[in-house]
């Protein structure tokens, strides 16, 4: 059987990313101008690929820290904290010990844990360093972003998942933290047009603009 030469899912780099020139230009332009962005489309329509491609553009990659956080599998605020911490950690690892140490010092309620898979490759995860309210860890993560050495772009994929968290006022808590977070532009990406529209268009919701 012949191997399929075509990429059917995922992002494999700019040389395999077809079309969406205008979308990439529009998105990078909005982010560079300091605009938060809501990105909606059905699942498997290329939102994540567009974000990764935009993050890889020279004008973005050379000037910003970029973090892509997928929260589709999260079910509560603690899961969100771990997803954010792990995504930030994975971007910091190639930058060396100094960057990692600053993260660990600022976000003291979380600690990075390294394990090795059967192939000998290191894997990093996040664990609580002590029993803390996840809201406290979230505060520390946002503090880290505000004090970053250069501007950040944070994309939260499947953002509508926070609607289903059991904790109260998650939207209001995140809205407050995001408003206070300096130095950071946000992308709220999701596949549920109905839920995202309600979150950002309804005057009764915290993210109403």
PLM features per residue range, with description:
Residues 198-209:
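Helix-loop-helix "sensor" segment of P-loop NTPases
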Residues 124-193, 201-203:
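Conserved Walker B catalytic segment
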Residues 34, 72-77, 161, 191-195:
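Conserved nucleotide-binding/hydrolysis micro-motifs of P-loop NTPases
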Residues 1-37, 42:
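A short, basic N-terminal segment
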Residues 42-45, 49-153:
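P-loop NTPase nucleotide-binding core
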Residues 37, 67-69, 187:
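Hydrophobic/aromatic beta-strand patches that form the interior of the parallel beta-sheet core
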Residues 62-66, 182-184, 208-209:
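Short glycine-/polar-rich loops that comprise or flank the Walker A/P-loop
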Residues 29, 53-60, 86, 176-179, ...:
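Short, well-ordered alpha-helices that flank and scaffold nucleotide-derived cofactor binding pockets
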């Amino acid at each position: 059987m012949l191997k399929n030469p075509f990429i059917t899912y995922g992002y494999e780099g700019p040389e395999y990313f077809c079309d969406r020139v205008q979308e990439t230009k529009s998105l990078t332009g909005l982010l560079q101008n300091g605009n938060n962005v809501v990105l909606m489309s059905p699942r498997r329509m290329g939102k994540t690929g567009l974000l990764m491609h935009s993050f890889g553009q020279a004008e973005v990659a050379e000037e910003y820290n970029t973090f892509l956080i997928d929260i589709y599998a999260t079910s509560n605020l603690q899961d969100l904290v771990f997803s954010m911490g792990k995504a930030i950690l994975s971007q910091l690892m190639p930058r060396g010990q100094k960057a990692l140490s600053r993260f660990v010092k600022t976000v003291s309620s979380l600690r990075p844990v390294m394990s090795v898979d059967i192939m000998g490759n290191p894997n990093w995860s996040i664990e609580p360093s002590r029993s803390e309210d996840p809201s406290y860890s979230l505060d520390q993560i946002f503090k880290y972003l505000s004090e970053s050495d250069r501007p950040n772009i944070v994309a939260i994929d499947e953002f509508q998942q926070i609607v289903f968290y059991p904790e109260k006022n998650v939207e209001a808590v995140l809205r407050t933290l995001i408003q206070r977070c300096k130095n950071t532009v946000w992308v709220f990406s999701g596949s549920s047009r109905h839920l995202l529209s309600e979150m950002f268009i309804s005057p009764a919701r915290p993210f109403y603009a």
